[in-house]
Amino acid sequence: MAPPPSLAGLQVEATAFPPSVKPPGSSNTLFLGGAGVRGLEIQGNFVKFTAIGVYLEDNAVPLLAVKWKGKTAEELSESVEFFRDIVTGPFEKFIQVTTILPLTGQQYSEKVSENCVAFWKSVGIYTDAEGKAIEKFIEVFKDQNFPPGASILFTQSPKGSLTICFSKDASVPEAANAVIENKLLSEAVLESILGKHGVSPAAKRSLAARLSELLNGCK
């Protein structure tokens, strides 16, 4: 087994993302692939809503290296296919979304659901099973509120489950709030961040830069 990737942690606004984390619902320690803000241009100002960190299982590096070794950070950051390979790859992923501005669970889940459904419809894979998974996703968030500094945590298993946790700060709890067994929903949550229309270009650039370095160091 290759030694785990050695990358530093990252600071995004007030949130410090550690270099590695053991996610809820997992027995593995994952490394920090990249992190960045999610924001929107509002009346000429860039308003930052959340800080997002994306962690990957160690075996992501050799698996991605087969196709992507030798590419520059810029080439990776502009490749829709590269991020699709991260989203659908057979390795665990963990996503930490920490709020910068206050957010209700309803606001968050409705926006994520909207992005997931739009993606599924664009690729023609929306079925009743996905509809039910979305209903469950919205239900999990219904009574939640996220003041600044609170976190929403997703663990994605390659087998298809999505483990959801909430934390009042940036710490990672051991127990899950919910587990949804739907592979397409699990992937779509990350797709909504890293995909072609992903909500965090900053996290995509960070992932591309850090992974380019790791992939090019692959033997």
Curated annotation (Swiss-Prot):
Keyword Isomerase: yes
Site (Important for catalytic activity): Y108
Disulfide bonds: none
Keyword terms of this UniProt record: Flavonoid biosynthesis, Isomerase
Annotated catalysed reactions: a chalcone = a flavanone
Signal peptide: none
GO biological process entries: flavonoid biosynthetic process
Record keyword Lipid metabolism present: no
Positions with a binding annotation for substrate: T50, N115, S192
Functional pathway: Secondary metabolite biosynthesis; flavonoid biosynthesis
Any one GO molecular-function label of the UniProt entry: chalcone isomerase activity
SUPFAM superfamilies registered for this protein in UniProt: Chalcone isomerase
One Pfam family in the UniProt entry: Chalcone
EC number annotated for this UniProt entry: 5.5.1.6
Family: Belongs to the chalcone isomerase family.
Record's function text: Catalyzes the intramolecular cyclization of bicyclic chalcones into tricyclic (S)-flavanones. Responsible for the isomerization of 4,2',4',6'-tetrahydroxychalcone (also termed chalcone) into naringenin.
Additional observations: Part of the biosynthetic pathway for all classes of flavonoids, a large class of secondary plant metabolites, many of which are brightly colored.
Protein name in the entry: Chalcone--flavanone isomerase
Source species of the chain: Pyrus communis
